[in-house]
A protein has these predicted regions:
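Hydrolase catalytic cores
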Residues: 144, 257-326
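Subtilisin-like serine protease catalytic core
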Residues: 71-82, 88-102, 110-159, 227, ...
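Structural recognition of the beta-strand scaffold that forms the well-ordered cores
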Residues: 81-85, 138-143, 173, 178-183, ...
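N-terminal domain-start motif of subtilase-like serine proteases
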Residues: 55-82, 106-111, 327
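Active-site-adjacent substrate-recognition loops and nearby beta-strands
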Residues: 67, 72, 210-229, 233-250, ...
């Protein structure tokens, strides 16, 4: 069993966003060995009966984060587009009636009931008119196959996967998403994922990803390990670190991981789940509210606000909760334009990729398409290497020689 020092919990700031009931809980960052390592969270029976046809209208996180107050003040995510990379979302779920959800997938997978339930739960946290963090946001859903999927359906064409992490991230960026929420483990992804994340950073798109539920350091198996990605761990409603939550150098913040009211995917009976998946969707939703409130702030400044408002003492970083549990109130109260226009999570503890130089080169169009085949299709080479033209017929990327903005900066 591993323990970290407990510390006093800062007082919450209205209208919402605090850790622990009334902000009085101590932060005991405690990790224990746990069997609760299910991909969608650990399941326990819910005590309250409900009918499957009725919408689930109560969630503990809704009162915990004072989201009713946020809605009353107009913080609903209106005008913001969130991308959800997960299984297929059941848009017929009563909790999602009235939500704006658009399936932007390029293909259709054959998923299990478990995978559909997980994706539907994530969509519920994000945009449900009843309990969603950002009920007026537009949600783009992208179908990703995972361990629970039955088959890849129409998603594999001529050996190319149309639903890989890098393909879906690039598609979400091209579709205009401002925030991407991913509550899935990844394993090894290769260089294509690195350039997809560089693409998101270059376009000012925030990726939020779960830390995992293995009660272990899982920095190598989740997207949070990458530069610029908001890795999310889980806390309990008393403010302590959740025993099931993984941790690692990629963690940036934390949020409540449960209990979350849902339906069992097999029996359709009420149950509760918990996990970093829920924490991730909560963080993505709160970032959408910050985007709505501060439309003129840059992505870097929004991220600066996230780490500077984290509830760790002095916002100091640790591998369990990053810079501290998210303070939703701080994100909408504090004007992020006061902060530097610099990405505070571009380089993570122990090193991460893409490097700052790789992101800068990608942004300026200076990564040669002859050096890697894994660049996004939308990438345009703007460097001065005229030898690239010799290979133009074999390349998928456009070439605009000598047009990099770096050449014109003073």
């Amino acid at each position: 069993m591993t323990h970290a020092q407990a510390c006093a919990q800062p007082a919450p700031r209205s209208p919402f966003g605090f850790v622990g009931r009334a902000g009085r809980a101590a932060r005991a960052l405690t990790t224990t060995t746990s069997a609760l390592a299910l991909a969608a969270g650990a399941l326990t029976l819910a005590p309250a009966p409900a009918h499957a046809a009725d919408p689930i209208t109560t969630q503990e996180y809704f009162s915990y984060y004072h989201l009713d107050s946020a809605r009353q003040k107009g913080y609903t995510g209106k005008g913001i587009t969130i991308a959800l990379i997960d299984g297929p979302v059941d848009t017929n779920a009563p909790e999602l009636a009235g939500a704006t959800i658009i399936d932007k997938s390029r293909c259709t997978i054959e998923d299990s009931a478990k995978g559909i339930r997980h994706a539907t739960d994530m969509a519920t946290i994000l945009v449900s008119p009843y309990t969603g963090v950002a009920p007026d946001a537009t949600l783009y859903s992208y179908q990703l196959s995972n361990n629970s999927s039955i088959s890849e359906g129409t998603c594999k064409t001529d050996g190319k996967k149309l639903n890989s992490f890098d393909t879906l991230i690039n598609q979400a960026v091209e579709d205009g998403a401002q925030i991407i929420s991913i509550s899935q483990g990844t394993g090894y992804l290769g260089t294509a994922a690195k350039w997809a994340i560089a693409n998101a950073i270059a376009h000012g798109v925030i990726i939020v990803a779960s830390a995992g539920n293995a009660s272990d350091d899982e920095n190598t198996t989740h997207l949070g390990r990458y530069s610029g990605v908001v890795g999310v761990s889980a806390i309990n409603t008393d403010g302590t670190f959740a025993s099931y939550s993984s941790w690692g150098n990629g963690v940036v913040t934390a949020a409540v991981g449960g209990p979350f009211n849902t339906l069992d995917e097999n029996t359709n009976q009420p149950t509760t789940v918990q996990g970093t998946s829920m924490s991730t969707a909560l963080v993505a939703g709160m970032l959408a509210l910050a985007r709505q409130k501060w439309p003129n702030a840059t992505t870097n400044q929004i991220l600066q606000s996230l780490v500077r408002s984290g509830l760790n003492p002095n916002h100091e970083w640790n591998q369990y909760t990053g810079y501290g549990a998210i303070d939703g109130g701080g994100l909408v109260i504090d004007d992020p334009s006061q902060y530097p226009d610099e990405n505070p999570i571009l380089q993570k503890q122990g090193g991460s990729e893409p490097t700052a130089d790789e992101v800068a080169d990608y942004t300026d169009g200076l990564v040669s398409p002859t050096s890697t085949v894994d660049l996004p299709d939308s990438y345009v080479y703007r460097g001065a290497d005229d030898q690239v033209v010799l290979y133009q017929s074999d390349l998928k990327n456009e070439i605009h020689l000598g047009t990099s903005p770096r050449y014109h900066r003073k």
